[in-house]
Amino acid sequence: MINKNNKIVFMGSPDFAVFILKGLVENKFNVVGVITSPDRPAGRGQKIKQSPVKKYALNNKLNLFQPKNLKDRIFINKLKNLNADLQIVVAFRMLPKILWNLPPLGTFNLHASLLPNYRGAAPINWAIINGETETGVTTFFIDDKIDTGEIIMQSKVKILPSDNAGTLHDKLMTVGQEIVLETIQKINQSAETKAQINDKELKSAPKLFKENCKIKWDNNAKQIMNQIRGLNPYPGAWTFLINNGTKIEIKILKVKLERQSHSHKIGNIITDKSSIKICILEGFINLIEFKFPGKKQMDVKSFLNGFSFDINAKMI
């Protein structure tokens, strides 16, 4: 039996974290506080936006905190007054020791990789970009470094050739909800956690910047396909389209590989009324779905209805 009497403080912000919090609430755990990021301007209109966790907390009348500074004395005192037994962190930010050291049962984090591999901000994306066939989720006790604490539990998930960052995100989210509940039980039973693993030759998952996401068409087919899959739906692999003397940025979301010998230059565009092909070393990348800045996602057929390529059109 899982002890549901523990007072739990939950910390997180995005949809991934909402699903874990939802699991705690629906399974009748005693969530005494929820900490999420402050409201921030977002999007083209810079409208103030609430985090998904905040929306869920408000809808379920949970005790909500949005500190700008995690070391703020007033906030820390409010947290102490909750007398939490355990804190759970999912997709939040680095915590100061004064925060993670508060509860008697500790503070554990759910991370979307099989630690110690893929420490960092973008483990789901990098696992696909690097061509992994397996990843998973890990729960571990937080310490003063990033994703280095004592491992509690892990669960593996296969990465299928058809997976992209979006589908893998949802798989890991589902498995993550299960492992968080199991981790609470394990901590209550005072079961031994795993020993830390040797850190040599590990793969990392650093934050994705725009330059990480630019497609290099002279890479091999596997690298290009994995990059596009690993960045779909967010933040999106991108390239420049050169056409009729203009240079337009375009996000490539879904493609199909066609292996075939050809004599065209890398990046050249081959098109007819129903397809757009980009030339690569091992054949062609067939575009299926893509997006221009400020426009909705579109398919090739819709795009070609009102667009024409010149003979020298290419992707760079």
Residue map of PLM features:
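Donor/substrate-binding cores of folate-linked one-carbon enzymes
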Residues: 6, 26-30, 37, 86-211
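Short beta->alpha connector loops
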Residues: 13-16, 69-71, 91-94, 258
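N-terminal glycine-/serine-/threonine-rich beta1-alpha1-beta2 phosphate-ribose binding loop
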Residues: 41-83
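Amphipathic, non-transmembrane alpha-helical secondary structure
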Residues: 18, 22-26, 76-80, 97, ...
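N-terminal Rossmann-like dinucleotide-binding module
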Residues: 1-44
